[in-house]
Amino acid sequence: MTYTPLEPTYFFQDSWMAKHLYDLKPSHHYDVGSSAKTMGILSQFTPITMIDIRPIELELDNLFFKKGSILELPFKDNSIETLSSLCVVEHIGLGRYGDELDPYGSEKAIKELKRVLKVGGVMLFSVPVDCENKVYFNAHRAFTRDYILELFEGFQLLEEKYHYGAEMFASYEPQKGFGTGFYMMKKS
């Protein structure tokens, strides 16, 4: 039997994101650096502003664009109700997208995401996970669950899911090796 080719990470990630954004029903959602294709689809039921260092050329009702860096977001402290950043922070500081090399790029990006999310606001976040913190040079980093939760200290973990291979799991299973973690968190 021949199957339709799919990239499982983005299939699971985008479905997970859509479910939560639909359930949350924010008046306006903000996304930093994720897929323009995904945000375009989701903008059809929730107004979305995308923030990225690379502008998009297309226009779509309910989809707005703001040029900006995840290291210096163009928003006031505690100003955003719902925020997402899907498979983005693991690239920051590795030079892959023309950014400067910085061994703490991911940590600085997370600090900035935390800064702009209002108290009581919800963060939808995904990153590669592994059995230890690693750098796959010039591609991305991978993190342990404990390290991610440490970086989001002061946030309440509402849900976590993990993708390994072609399956989703409800718990972190480091013995499975490389995967992707999906986290829904509320700022306390």
Question: Residue locations for each model-derived region?
Answer:
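Acceptor-substrate binding/catalytic loop of class I
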Residues: 103-104, 125, 130-147
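A short glycine-rich, Lys/Arg-flanked "PGG" loop and its adjoining helix->strand segment in the class I
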Residues: 101-122
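Class I SAM-dependent methyltransferase SAM/SAH-binding core
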Residues: 23, 28-73
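Core SAM-dependent methyltransferase catalytic element
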Residues: 168-188
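A conserved beta-strand element that flanks and buttresses the S-adenosyl-L-methionine
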Residues: 84, 89, 93
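Short alpha-helix
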Residues: 111, 139-162, 178-182
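Class I SAM-dependent methyltransferase Rossmann-like catalytic core
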Residues: 1-25
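A short acidic, Gly/Pro-enriched loop at the edge of an enzyme's catalytic core
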Residues: 71-83
